[in-house]
Curated annotation (Swiss-Prot):
Organism: Nitrobacter hamburgensis (strain DSM 10229 / NCIMB 13809 / X14)
Coiled-coil region(s): none
Name of the protein described by the UniProt record: Ubiquinone/menaquinone biosynthesis C-methyltransferase UbiE
Catalyzed reactions per annotation: a 2-demethylmenaquinol + S-adenosyl-L-methionine = a menaquinol + S-adenosyl-L-homocysteine + H(+); a 2-methoxy-6-(all-trans-polyprenyl)benzene-1,4-diol + S-adenosyl-L-methionine = a 5-methoxy-2-methyl-3-(all-trans-polyprenyl)benzene-1,4-diol + S-adenosyl-L-homocysteine + H(+)
Keywords of this entry: Menaquinone biosynthesis, Methyltransferase, S-adenosyl-L-methionine, Transferase, Ubiquinone biosynthesis
GO function terms (MF aspect): 2-methoxy-6-polyprenyl-1,4-benzoquinol methyltransferase activity; demethylmenaquinone methyltransferase activity
Pfam families assigned to the protein according to its UniProt record, in alphabetical order: Ubie_methyltran
Job of this protein: Methyltransferase required for the conversion of demethylmenaquinol (DMKH2) to menaquinol (MKH2) and the conversion of 2-polyprenyl-6-methoxy-1,4-benzoquinol (DDMQH2) to 2-polyprenyl-3-methyl-6-methoxy-1,4-benzoquinol (DMQH2).
């Protein structure tokens, strides 16, 4: 239970724990309309490769077997759409996001891609999911967990809503582990991304927060321990693109 005076980080700032969600909501309200474009620009398109790797790991059934995916912090629908296109007719995805602006963009994209019969959008909080116990075959979260104020609560909720045998997959920015690349990555992150955000979205501060939040996120081994503590078994991870991102996996057995 939260205590008076409890704090957490919002980028490099310490803020009251209860304030972080409101601050994060403001970030994504400001950038929702250009979020997908900025992902392409910031990563030179690599985010598409990383998300495709997530879907390869997910490996949804290609036949009519029913398969229910919960994509949390899925906003504009990238993961859910990729999974739907890779899966068979029994696939259904629920995109859950706390930000209605992101969900609105995602719903419009689903209609344009003729995927609205397979992908639905629900406003909700990762820490208190409004879904029944053991109701999903898989849970994905891509570039969202670091924005959650209470990560341990979100992980416990992920475990709760998964069926036995269900899989948890988390794609998140990580720690660059290639000498030389780390300095280039830091320079690009702090000197290029915020001005780029200002030029494309009119908002540099939101992207300053996003690059700072990456540096505050636990290293892969520490995050793996958090996943285990939530009850998951067979926890593994792989780093991609020299450690720019990590893909964590766990199972509810």
């Amino acid at each position: 239970m939260d205590q008076p005076g409890d704090t957490t980080h919002f980028g490099f700032r310490d803020v009251p724990l209860g304030d972080k969600q409101t601050l994060v909501n403001g970030v994504f309200h400001n950038v929702a309309q250009r979020y997908d474009l900025m992902n392409d620009l910031m990563s030179a398109g690599l985010h598409r490769v990383w998300k495709d790797a997530t879907i390869t790991a997910l490996n949804p059934p290609r036949n009519d077997t029913p398969f229910a995916l919960l994509d949390v912090a899925g906003g504009t629908g990238d993961i859910a759409f990729r999974a739907a296109k890779a899966a068979g007719l029994g696939f259904r995805a629920t995109v859950c996001d706390i930000n209605p602006d992101m969900l609105a963009v995602g719903h419009e994209r689903a209609i344009k891609q003729h995927l609205d019969h397979q992908v639905s959008f629900v406003e909700g909080n990762a820490e208190t999911l409004a879904f029944a116990d053991r109701s999903f075959d898989a849970y994905t979260i891509a570039f969202g967990i670091r924005n959650v104020p209470r990560i341990d609560s979100a992980l416990r909720e992920a475990f709760r809503v998964l069926k036995p045998g269900g899989r948890f997959l988390c794609l998140e920015f990580s720690t660059v582990d290639v000498p030389g690349l780390d300095k280039i990555y830091d320079l690009f992150s702090f000197k290029v991304i915020p001005p780029l955000g200002r030029a494309v979205t009119g908002d540099a501060d939101s992207y300053q927060y996003l690059v700072e939040s990456i540096r505050k996120f636990p290293k892969p081994n520490a995050f793996a321990d958090m996943i285990r503590d939530a009850g998951f078994a067979r926890v593994t991870w792989q780093v991609l693109s020299g450690g720019i991102v990590a893909l964590h996996s766990g199972w509810r057995l």
